Design a protein with these regions (language model features):
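Flexible coil segments in periplasmic/lumen-exposed cytochrome c-class electron-transfer proteins
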Residues: 28-38, 107-139
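Gly/Gly-Pro-rich "capping" loops immediately C-terminal to redox-active cysteine motifs
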Residues: 60, 64-104
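Bacterial N-terminal signal peptides
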Residues: 11-21
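Electrostatic cytochrome c docking/interface patches
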Residues: 24-50, 66
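The canonical Cys-X-X-Cys-His
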Residues: 47, 51-61, 113
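Bacterial N-terminal signal peptides that target proteins for export
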Residues: 2-13
């Protein structure tokens, strides 16, 4: 009788484990809605998506920057973002260790990520960068 109880307990434990692991896996997939670019151009369209998939690899998820194999400046409360043309220039052309992303982003994508940086992470620069501003800066 005890053996039957142990077998029943084991079956219940296996079923519960499978159910919990499936639920956890579904939750992980629901929270990880990032897009991944394939090819030479980024497919992300919002500033948040672009920052999350392009910029945060170096500047960190909280935009605090890092020092290690290189020096990645903090974007938190960064006064260099005040003049909108400067971050547009950096994203398009790069500088020092930062590559330029101008060939990989449309004018709208550059504007989106610059506007996101200028209005998040302790930055409150409300003048909006447009795709036309980026196009004009590329000339």
């Amino acid at each position: 009788m005890r053996a039957k109880a142990n077998i029943a307990f084991m079956k219940i434990a296996v079923v519960m484990s499978l159910a919990l692991s499936t639920a956890a896996s579904a939750q992980d997939k629901a929270q990880d809605n990032r897009t991944f670019s394939s090819g030479y151009r980024f497919v992300e369209m919002t500033g948040e998506e672009l920052f999350g998939n392009v910029c945060q690899g170096c500047h960190m998820p909280d935009a605090a920057g890092a020092i290690g194999a290189g020096s990645y400046p903090s974007l938190v409360g960064n006064r260099n973002l005040e003049a909108s043309g400067y971050p547009v220039y950096l994203v398009v052309n790069g500088r020092r260790g930062m590559p330029g992303f101008g060939d990989m982003m449309t004018d709208g994508q550059v504007a989106a990520v610059v506007n996101y940086l200028r209005t998040h992470f302790g930055n409150n620069y409300q003048d909006v960068v447009t795709a036309r501003d980026v196009r004009d800066a590329r000339r």
